[in-house]
């Protein structure tokens, strides 16, 4: 009865033709339900032959109906047994049953006959199947519980909402009490089929109830529903989320009829939940007993109690399968490693996982050590079981590995066979020399604050210390993250430069004095008395360019080295910020020509004084225009403009020639237009 599908098309009654004396036969096609009869997957509409005595005075070829309005009269199945009262009219039927009930009841009678034939076939196949105990599968055992289990009722529900109620033929139970939903008790062994919508008002506790109230529910979960599909003789899609109720006898039949080809690797545990009332005074309380009847679970035993749609089904609360409880076995990820290598790796990880001893700091304390303690002799030679101090990484207190853990792992210099004794001795010497040089930070950074400009080239300085400093220490300093600079002082000597002549030394001293003076004064203003002025009466001082200082060449016959020019440029940059830039006064028109000549003409060389008090011939080379003719034209234009302005002023005294010039700027607008 699995995967049955009702259709909206029903067959109407057909005329009954009289074949012989006193009996008539009518063939009615049943299309209210499509059944897959067999394993070939074909949908068949099986006609049913009805036999009944013809109604008297019924003309031939006229449709025969009953007085109830279009319903067939009471008919009997020729090949099946109809329970008494099954065809009588009912007043409590639902709307779907009252509509065209004649054809529907006829189809239901035929389906009951098919069910009985299918279960008979199942009994024959169960006897032909091999014993499951030979395959290593446990047979379900029958559980006996206290109580008067004189009879039981089976309720089976498929995926489309069809419930099948049956009464075991071997149990002496009052079948009339269990068939109260139908008018008339069914015969023994006959299945009652009705849609579950008609029985929605019934409680869910009706499944497998004993007369004394004992309820036995067997839940088939997962792929075990395939057995029920095979039992009905039809192949349908798996619907493991449905509840199938069965008596204990049905469980025994399941054990007899189960086959490995239907169970396979998808077989799961079968559970039976039995709820029995207590025999004592506490009759209202119930105790649930759950016992695993069959252990046929395999690798998919963890999916017990879940259907394909994820609906939970009552079953055992925990998996008792030994396969599910076995521990996962670890596989070797690196097959190249031998057991000895793996043991070494385990030892190293175990040593690293151990923390420092209690009360001992995991991080080294650098506050109490000097700047040279990072490269002490102890880091290489004094500790036999340790590593050099500069190799140790400071670990935090939050769970890192301490240097003691590294020492406990057996790491030492003997683990590096590539180093020879001579190389180790060189390493010790380099570390010792570096530690001696790093005792004082003042030897690394020169103190420029207390050293004057005269101490730049003295005897104790860069060259002497550079000659004494070993080359290997520079590379060692780079490896330790420090700046590779030579430990030097702030003093040097001119004797270290034998190529310099007396003139070069004189130039150096002069440049040194100029630089020192410029640094001391900075950007202070110098008195304008030292500036050169043209004797042009009321004119302002000419503007002096910041870069108008001419290079000082003491002796043109002597060669000058390139570094002297660099010193001269530095001096010029320092001096150019000390000159005052006087502004040109252009308040009067008569000074325009003079100012223009001073800016654009060729001024004569003038004597001036620099910031050091020396007299020099200053020529502002940058202020001289490269086009003198254009400059003269501009100067003449300025003079002509001044003369024209004077003429206009004299003509406008009476305001007759140009009347608008006597007005203000606003009054001039519109005058003379």
Curated annotation (Swiss-Prot):
Composition skew (Basic and acidic residues), residue ranges: 288-303, 520-534, 638-673
Q: Where does this protein have compositionally biased stretches of type Polar residues?
A: 171-183, 193-216, 234-246, 268-277
List all Low complexity biased stretches: 278-287
Q: Where is this region: Disordered?
A: 36-73, 171-216, 229-409, 478-497, 520-552, 585-673
Name the keywords, alphabetized.
Answer: Crown gall tumor, Plasmid
The note filed under miscellaneous reads: The Ti plasmid contains at least six transcriptional units, designated vir loci, which are essential for efficient crown-gall tumorigenesis.
Identify this protein by name: Protein VirD3
Which organism's genome codes for this protein?
Agrobacterium fabrum (strain C58 / ATCC 33970)
